[in-house]
Every structure is written in structure tokens, then in C-alpha cells.
């Protein structure tokens, strides 16, 4: 991302990138949209296949998920399309998809993304 340049991305034209998660024994899918070189902030589309829940973990970054399709299942409840869920930095959490349907979210971090399983 160049400073001072607008970015427009046709997300429909991007291919889903498969990311195998050894802890879960399943793949998750993403489309990377933007990474800010100054702050490390990241924006991506993430798809959790039906039944996949990312087990208890933390991040050294805050992050939000805007639900586009399906239902986001979290340790605090379920959230459908149009919902925005914010997770503070360091919070222990679980999130993923319902058993019967994939969930697609717009995933936004405030700095570089890392995951630490508990």
C-alpha cells in the first residue's frame, strides 16, 4: 500500500487462499485486502467452513469482525449478517461458524496479526 494512494479491490475476483490450521486440523480461507506498512493494521475477508470453531486463543492485537454471510459463533453468543463484533487486545476468545453453514467476515486488526492458543 503506497502512502497517499487510494486502493480499490474487486473482492469477487480474488481467489480464496487456503490456510491449514494445525491446531484445528482444518483449513480456513482468506482474501488479504490491505496491510498498512506503518501500523501493521490488516483487513481481510475470512471464511470459516461450517462447523469450524477457532478454539480458545488470544491476539496481541485488537480485531473486529463484520459478518457478511452466515452466523459468527463466539464464546459470547451468535451474530448474523450485518453484526460487528470487536475483540479487545489480549482477550481470550473462541469464534467460527455454525455446524450447518460457512461464515464470511470482514476481519480488521489494529496492528500486526498473531495468534496464541491457550
Language model segments and positions:
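Short glycine/proline-enriched turns and hinge-like loops at secondary-structure junctions
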Residues: 40, 58-60, 77-79, 98-99
Amino acid at each position: 500500500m503506497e502512502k497517499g494512494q487510494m486502493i480499490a479491490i474487486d473482492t469477487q475476483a480474488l481467489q480464496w487462499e487456503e490456510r491449514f490450521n494445525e491446531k484445528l486440523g482444518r483449513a480456513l480461507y482468506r482474501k488479504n485486502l490491505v496491510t498498512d506498512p506503518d501500523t501493521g493494521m490488516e483487513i481481510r475477508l475470512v471464511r470459516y467452513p461450517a462447523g469450524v470453531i477457532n478454539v480458545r486463543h488470544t491476539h496481541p492485537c485488537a480485531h473486529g469482525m463484520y459478518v457478511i454471510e452466515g452466523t459468527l459463533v463466539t464464546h459470547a453468543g451468535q451474530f448474523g449478517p450485518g453484526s460487528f463484533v470487536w475483540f479487545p487486545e489480549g482477550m481470550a476468545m473462541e469464534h467460527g461458524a455454525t455446524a450447518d453453514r460457512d461464515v464470511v467476515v470482514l476481519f480488521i486488526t489494529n496492528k500486526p496479526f498473531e495468534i496464541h492458543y491457550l
